[in-house]
């Protein structure tokens, strides 16, 4: 499926936009990583996802698809690493991850 079809599905406005399925999300990520979309299409897709708000399933599928293209990091066990998520600022929630990570380390 071309990226235009995915953009059309998620860019229909706040009430008509639909979440992508697991397979659709993986297909989109593959298109993006393999350079099969123009810069304008990538921008349109990312803006539509931002307005629609990504679902947990979509994010998990994007991550699963991207992992097929990236070698895992080799980090020594004695090194304390904290993976801090990015917050887009759209949600009005308390971000306890950073505070919890500081306490844990």
Spell out what each predicted region is.
Residues 1-96, 104:
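Acidic, glycine/proline-rich low-complexity segments that act as flexible tails and inter-domain linkers
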């Amino acid at each position: 499926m071309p990226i235009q079809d995915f953009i059309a599905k998620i860019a229909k406005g706040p009430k008509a936009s639909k979440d992508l399925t697991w397979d659709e999300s993986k297909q989109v990520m593959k298109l993006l990583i393999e350079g099969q979309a123009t810069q304008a299409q990538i921008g349109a897709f990312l803006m539509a996802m931002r307005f629609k708000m990504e679902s947990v399933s979509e994010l998990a599928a994007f991550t699963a698809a991207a992992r097929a293209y990236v070698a895992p990091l080799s980090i020594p066990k004695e090194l304390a690493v904290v993976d801090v998520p990015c917050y887009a600022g759209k949600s009005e929630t308390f971000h306890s991850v950073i505070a919890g990570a500081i306490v844990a380390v």
